[in-house]
Structure formats: structure tokens, C-alpha cells
Amino acid sequence: MTHQQPFIAVIPARLASTRLPNKPLADLGGKPMVVRVAERAREAGAQQVLVASDAQSVLDAARDHGFEAVLTRADHPSGTDRLAEVAATFGWSDDTVVVNVQGDEPLIDPMLVRDVASHLAAHPDCAIATAAHPIHDAADVFNPNVVKVALDARNVAMYFSRAPIPWSRDAYLPHWPDVATMPPPAFPVHRHIGLYAYRARFLRTYPSLAQAPVEQAEQLEQLRAMWHGERIAVLITEHAPEAGIDTPADLARVQALFRPGSK
């Protein structure tokens, strides 16, 4: 059983989105999306819930619903960089656990948020903890929008990739390059869940780390930490989380769930 770890939840929320403008303020059952996410973080038991944004309208929406909000710079290349600014602003102690709850995940399971924080506390040799779940469909394995993680014997990440990892030579080569005929994986393949817990001392060093070639190639910010020698503990959950909101179709799907009478 995992120990209940005290933690702070930070919700980075960018107003600019190419596929879904003003996404943090999208209405979900009478409340902005960013507020729905903050409510989930509060349900997870966070000691403090902070919304971090470069847009005053997002900060106002959070404060109007009783949540703390902090203004951040507009030029951050990633959510982790935004969290690093918040950590520097508040001066949290080195061992403070800070969980990055994505601002477009209004259906995130509060228990998963809590468990990832506890997972970091259980791995003092790791700077970051995250989560993953098994996938069994070849279409997911070969989908570049599904990020996979390869794990060592302790479930510490060895690599994250949009490519199919681990690559099953004997199973896949006879079908390559016809992805449609690929068999389901006969070995554990894990999909990364974009939920992170950090130690505050790592967040303070993150902005000084040069971007890594693999980070730029894969467009995966967690690879910067690994490139510079940091370890990432991965919590395995058997339950796939609800999908986040990236497109108008995603928004319509989730809005339907928040309508009165929906289940």
C-alpha cells in the first residue's frame, strides 16, 4: 500500500491553443475547464492547488471559484518550465513534492494524482514520477500520438518514444511495413500517462538544462531530464485514464458528460 504523501498540485494552463482556442475557459457544466481540473486536484488531497497561466482571464476564472492562481511568463516551451517558474516564485523546500496536473484533463482520476505523488516519495533516487498503463492493441503501439515507455526491472523508465517500443523483431518484421496487419503485442507494452510528480529541487534546476536532441526529435519534454541523467519512476496502473481534451470533438464529448442527467 502506498504512503499518503503530502503534495502541491500545479495546473499549467495556456490560453493559446492551435486546435482549440481558449481551451482552459471552455464551459463544462457551468464551470471553466481549468476549474474542473482544479477540483479534481483538490479531491486528490493536495495541500495547495495552484493554477499557473500567462493569461489574466484564466487566473480570474480560477480565483472566482476559490482557487489560488499565479501569473507566469508567456514564453515557456513546456509545462515543466512553467512549473519551474512557480517553484522559484514560492521558494518551496527541496523535498516538496509538486504534481503537474494537465489543464486539459478534467476527468483525471484523483486517486491516480495522489498515487503518483506517493510513488515519487517511495523512490528517493528518482527526481520524477509518472504513470503508465498496459496497451494491447497493435494500432496503439504503432500510433505516434500514443507515447510508449520502456521500463527496467524496477519500473524506472529507460526511454519514452512515439515509436513502437519495445520492438518485437520476430513478431513485427514479417508484417513490416504493413502496420494494419501487425499482431497484438505478445509482451508488456506501456502507454505513458502525462501526469508528473517532481521534487522542488529538480524543478529549480530544470530551466538550466539544455534541451536534448532526443527531446526535440520526439517532442517529449521528459526526455530532457533523462538526457541529463535524471531517473523517472513509473507507476503502473491497470486502468486507462479518460482521454484529455485537444480538439473540438473531444470538448463536445466531455461537455456531454457534464450535462445534467448524464452518467
Curated annotation (Swiss-Prot):
It holds the Pfam family CTP_transf_3. Keywords: Cytoplasm, Lipopolysaccharide biosynthesis, Nucleotidyltransferase, Transferase. It is found in: Cytoplasm. InterPro entries: Cytidylyl_trans, KdsB, Nucleotide-diphossugar_trans. One of its GO terms (biological process) is lipopolysaccharide biosynthetic process. GO terms for cellular component: cytosol. It catalyses: 3-deoxy-alpha-D-manno-oct-2-ulosonate + CTP = CMP-3-deoxy-beta-D-manno-octulosonate + diphosphate. It is an enzyme of class 2 (transferase). GO terms for molecular function: 3-deoxy-manno-octulosonate cytidylyltransferase activity. Disulfide bonds: none annotated. Pathway: Nucleotide-sugar biosynthesis; CMP-3-deoxy-D-manno-octulosonate biosynthesis; CMP-3-deoxy-D-manno-octulosonate from 3-deoxy-D-manno-octulosonate and CTP: step 1/1; Bacterial outer membrane biogenesis; lipopolysaccharide biosynthesis. Its EC number is 2.7.7.38. Activates KDO (a required 8-carbon sugar) for incorporation into bacterial lipopolysaccharide in Gram-negative bacteria. Belongs to the KdsB family. This is 3-deoxy-manno-octulosonate cytidylyltransferase 1. It comes from Burkholderia ambifaria (strain MC40-6). The gene is kdsB1.
